């Protein structure tokens, strides 16, 4: 029996390549339809979080000077966005900090007097249970009204109660608050 090289080796490869091309184009098409919707939903979610953290604000304008975004510890504690309320009532700062499960993203609202109006963790990779206790609303509430910090570390700052057993996660949240307060000072307030 004579073997047919094309049928045995080349034809299956051609078929698989064609299938891969069809699937690739189908995924690209679906992505082109869904990407703008996903982006719009992300913008709406961020705007809702800003409104929650600074209820006195009507609308926000992004602080555009990217060279003046605070970076307390390169790659570990840095501001990614700063939005200033158009009515001068304050600002909302988005910060990424190193936490137990990787980078933690939090938003911090600061009023026009430099006091924190709220803190919200929007993304994290911390361990569910103990690690996420540092992200709980009852833990984050302790920062409301704060306008300065005594120490960069949550454990060493007497004005903050850190979560015992979740020091790295507690520090991640605290670092973000410190970076947001530094951003407020650097921008010169909310005016």
Can you say where each PLM-predicted feature lies in the sequence?
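Flexible, solvent-exposed loop/hinge segments and secondary-structure transition points
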Residues: 2-191
């Amino acid at each position: 029996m004579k073997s047919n090289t094309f049928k045995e080796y080349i034809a299956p490869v051609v078929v698989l390549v064609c299938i891969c091309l069809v699937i690739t184009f189908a995924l690209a098409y679906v992505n082109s339809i869904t990407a703008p919707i996903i982006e719009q939903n992300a913008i709406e979610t961020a705007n809702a979080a800003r409104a929650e953290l600074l209820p006195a604000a009507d609308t926000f304008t992004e602080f555009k000077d990217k060279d003046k975004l605070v970076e307390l510890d390169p790659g570990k504690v840095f501001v990614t966005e700063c939005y200033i309320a158009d009515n001068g009532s304050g600002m909302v700062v988005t910060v990424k900090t190193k936490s137990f499960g990787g980078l933690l993203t939090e938003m911090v609202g600061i009023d026009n007097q430099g006091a924190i109006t709220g803190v919200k963790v929007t993304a994290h990779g911390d361990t569910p249970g103990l690690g996420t206790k540092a992200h709980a609303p009852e833990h984050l509430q302790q920062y409301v009204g704060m306008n300065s910090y005594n120490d960069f570390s949550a454990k060493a700052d007497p004005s903050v109660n850190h979560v015992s057993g979740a020091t790295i996660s507690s520090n991640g949240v605290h670092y973000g608050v410190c970076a947001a307060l530094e951003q407020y000072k650097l921008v010169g307030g909310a005016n």
